[in-house]
């Protein structure tokens, strides 16, 4: 893997990880269009560590408060407040993607990154996002989260295992269908992703150096630089996206997803672009 590839792909990762457009799908498309090869699921997972570090820093106060309340609540019932419950909701919501990720890890690394599937997922899931925007009541606050919400949003996060769907798109859409305010759904989805993405990145770290049968390998310095770039760009993307959601809908991203999906399908159909 060249340094140009590392820089471009890590910028793409940082820009798209928190937007409902699928970072893994964009990495697969960018790799094929500009570098004629897929960066691979392992490189994607490791660069996601950078963007998750951005989440940890951006939500540091929230995370610290949740962890403190969770441990206090375990020892004393009087400390079982909304943050204590939110800690449990994150734990419970993480279980589904942990199970599905382990069961289908081989499919995720290979066939699921086929650009026909990526482009189709971009288009099809845009309909889901649009429906969530249209039908979601958007009245519930974070204090009104329930166990049912954590399970449903956690199951929705599993859809992100397929490149082209989008983790934030899936979790925010689920939250909107459940009546959560748009920015509340986004914040909960970002918190929910932290355990899963950190575990996936650390688990994939060895394969990023020496991938077996998929993608390009990267050196240690390249992975460090990629992670740092993804962190910086990702931090800026989080700040912008959360402000954007306060006064804007996700219909903008729906249109973008459809256009990108159609363009990729056209390039694949005409033979300009290879599927894998």
Swiss-Prot record:
Species the sequence originates in: Mycolicibacterium smegmatis (strain ATCC 700084 / mc(2)155)
Note: Bacitracin is thought to be involved in the inhibition of peptidoglycan synthesis by sequestering undecaprenyl diphosphate, thereby reducing the pool of lipid carrier available.
Subcellular location: Cell membrane
Gene: uppP
Stated name of the protein: Undecaprenyl-diphosphatase
Record GO terms (molecular function): undecaprenyl-diphosphatase activity
Bridged cysteine pairs (disulfide): none
UniProt record similarity statement: Belongs to the UppP family.
GO cellular component, one term: plasma membrane
Entries under Pfam families matching the protein: BacA
Function in brief: Catalyzes the dephosphorylation of undecaprenyl diphosphate (UPP). Confers resistance to bacitracin.
One GO BP annotation of this record: peptidoglycan biosynthetic process
Keyword terms of this UniProt record: Antibiotic resistance, Cell membrane, Cell shape, Cell wall biogenesis/degradation, Hydrolase, Membrane, Peptidoglycan synthesis, Transmembrane, Transmembrane helix
Reactions the enzyme catalyzes: di-trans,octa-cis-undecaprenyl diphosphate + H2O = di-trans,octa-cis-undecaprenyl phosphate + phosphate + H(+)
Membrane-crossing segments per the record: 1-21, 39-59, 84-104, 115-135, 159-179, 188-208, 222-242, 253-273
NCBIfam families: PRK00281.2-1 (NF001392), undec_PP_bacA (TIGR00753)
The protein's enzyme class: hydrolase
UniProt cross-references to InterPro entries, sorted A to Z: UppP
